[in-house]
Regions:
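Aromatic- and glycine-rich beta-strand/loop motifs that create alpha-glucan
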Residues: 20-29
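Hydrophobic membrane-insertion alpha-helices, especially the h-region
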Residues: 29-51
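Extracytoplasmic "Venus flytrap"/periplasmic binding protein-like
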Residues: 106, 111-196
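Early extracytoplasmic/lumenal segment of secretory-pathway proteins
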Residues: 54-133
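N-terminal targeting leaders characterized by basic, low-complexity, disordered sequences
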Residues: 1-4
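Short amphipathic alpha-helical coupling segments at ligand-binding clamshell hinges
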Residues: 234-245
Length: 249
């Protein structure tokens, strides 16, 4: 049976279906479209809100899988502004710890986090992504992280190179090619500390497990922690300063 005929039959059957059946149909077919529209609206709303308050967001970081209060997030944003020497009261730094991200795409909240990252990256509102290595692996191999050599100064590269974490660009390319063909590319995340075992190693994240600032964000660190620079950033100077800020004693 032609696809269009099947679609027409489904639509006809839905006319007399219960609300629950109709809702399940809608959710199965349109949930990602719905998430996309919602996050675009959220991005627009945030822009309108900050504009109406006369404020400008000069830095935005997302840290995954932690549950901190808004007060903590605001204080950390203010502390970073002070560190960066930004004294304009109309400029704000936002730290967002409200999202969960895991390599297991079936876990609750993962879809929302990925949609938020996608939307805020495409609208140049996202600067830094941080969290457990499992979360950052997702960002690495979804193509959301910059090659650190493109952003960090030569001096910073010398200082932080011992903490660099690498992704394999060859795997990312194969994954993206498969996506273009609507195919699923299955792979195992390579060890990011062993670029010598990769086909095309690229430094895209920094191990921040021992940074005191990360220990405040994650009071009970039991795994490797990392941060990477969003490919959507237009605040490169502030991003460089934030990396230094995280490593401050």
């Amino acid at each position: 049976m032609p696809v269009m005929d099947e679609f027409k039959e489904e639509r006809a059957a839905l006319k007399n279906a219960s609300f629950k059946v109709k809702w399940n149909y809608f959710w199965d077919y349109y949930k990602w479209h719905t998430f996309g529209v919602l996050f675009v609206l959220i991005a627009i709303s945030m822009f309108i809100y900050t504009s109406s308050k006369g404020t400008e967001t000069v830095f935005y970081a997302m840290f995954f899988n932690t549950d901190l209060t808004e007060t903590f997030n605001e204080e950390m944003g203010k502390e970073f502004l002070a560190y960066a020497g930004i004294e304009d009261k109309k400029q704000v730094a936002l730290v967002d710890t409200s999202y969960y991200l895991s390599s297991d795409s079936t876990e609750s909240g993962v879809g929302s986090a990925l949609q938020k990252i996608s939307t805020f990256t495409s609208t140049n509102q996202l600067d830094v992504l941080g969290g457990p290595l499992d979360s950052i692996n997702v960002c690495m191999y979804d193509g959301y992280l910059y090659d650190l050599r493109m952003i960090l100064t030569e001096e910073q590269q010398e200082v932080y190179e011992p903490y660099f974490l690498y992704s394999d660009a060859a795997i990312l390319e194969k994954k993206q090619e498969a996506a273009k063909n609507s195919e699923i590319f299955e792979f195992t995340y390579p060890d990011p500390t062993k670029p010598e075992n990769m086909e095309e190693p690229v430094p895209v994240a920094i191990d921040v497990s021992n940074c005191k600032k990360m220990q405040l964000i994650y009071p009970e660190i039991t795994e490797q922690m990392a941060v990477g620079i969003s490919t959507g950033t237009i605040q490169q100077e502030n991003v460089r300063l934030f990396v230094d800020y995280l490593f401050e004693e």
